[in-house]
Amino acid sequence: MKSNKVTFFLGLFLVSAFCVRLTENMCFKDDDCINQGEWCPVLRVCSYAECICPWGTRSKLPSCQIICAHLDKKSVNSYNPCGCNYK
């Protein structure tokens, strides 16, 4: 019976540690992505609660949307010339 309690609390501890780790890695704004993950030559972007590196082929976002997001504006189109409007 004692071993069942120890196993239960060990399992509970591991589950709670896993949940804390998942929520710590989430981002809500671009500032949460500073100094996270692998090296990236440009500022990381928070996209769908995950930090991504918008560089080259690593990102599926068009460069125009990334530029507008850094300016805190909304992208008008994804093509050149890039147009941004206020949100």
Swiss-Prot record:
User: For this UniProt entry, which residues form the secretion signal?
Assistant: 1-19
> Quick one: a GO biological-process term for this protein?
defense response to fungus
Entry keywords, A to Z: Antimicrobial, Disulfide bond, Fungicide, Plant defense, Secreted, Signal
A GO cellular-component term linked to this record: extracellular region
Q: What is its main location?
A: secreted
Q: Answer whether the UniProt record assigns the keyword Ligase to this protein.
A: no
Q: Disulphide bridges in this chain?
A: 27-46, 33-51, 40-53
Give the top-rank taxon of the lineage listed in the UniProt record for this protein. Eukaryota
Q: Where in the cell is it found?
A: Secreted
Family statement: Belongs to the DEFL family.
Tell me what this protein is called.
Answer: Putative defensin-like protein 304
What lineage, starting at the top, does this entry show? Eukaryota, Viridiplantae, Streptophyta, Embryophyta, Tracheophyta
